[in-house]
A protein has these predicted regions:
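Conserved histidine-centered catalytic loops in small-molecule metabolism enzymes
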Residues: 41
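Active-site flanking residues adjacent to catalytic metal/cofactor-binding acidic residues
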Residues: 53
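Short, surface-exposed ligand- or partner-binding patches at beta-edge/loop junctions that are enriched
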Residues: 94
Length: 134
């Protein structure tokens, strides 16, 4: 309650701060692509509407990956972007924890791709949700 009173009493100082914070969160939420949950990825995959791109190393991919995903390690995204861009499906980027996918998404956006999704929490979130890997 005190915080609300402070913000109201100091409106001219607090309003710009609140606006900056909101803009920061909005810009980061779309950076690299739209973040989606594991359940949303399952829905896209079940409808055969997603190309799932696993950005982890080949070793990590071979030790367990999401069904029907392809492996394009993060370092190869620029070089192999034509494989991704040629897809008519939505692109879902998956990495270990979700942060590398943002960088790859930015790279693909620069190449002209628009329909990009990022698995929130990456493969770690997938495992914590007890979802299967092959």
């Amino acid at each position: 309650m005190e915080l609300i009173n402070f913000l109201i009493e100091h409106f001219y100082f607090s309003a710009p701060l609140v606006i900056i914070l909101i803009l920061f969160f909005i810009s980061n939420s779309k950076k690299g692509g739209t973040k989606i949950s594991c359940q949303s990825l399952i829905s896209l995959s079940n409808q055969d509407q997603a190309l799932i791109v696993d950005l982890r190393s080949s070793e990590a991919f071979n030790s367990g990956h999401i069904t029907a995903s392809i492996n394009i390690p993060l370092n190869d995204v620029s070089r192999r972007s034509n494989e991704i861009i040629s897809s008519t499906k939505s692109i879902v980027l998956v990495c270990e924890a979700g942060s590398s996918s943002t960088n790859a998404g930015e790279t693909l956006k620069k190449e002209g791709l628009k329909d990009i999704f990022i698995l929130r929490g990456g493969i770690n979130e997938w495992k914590m949700s007890n979802l299967p890997l092959v």
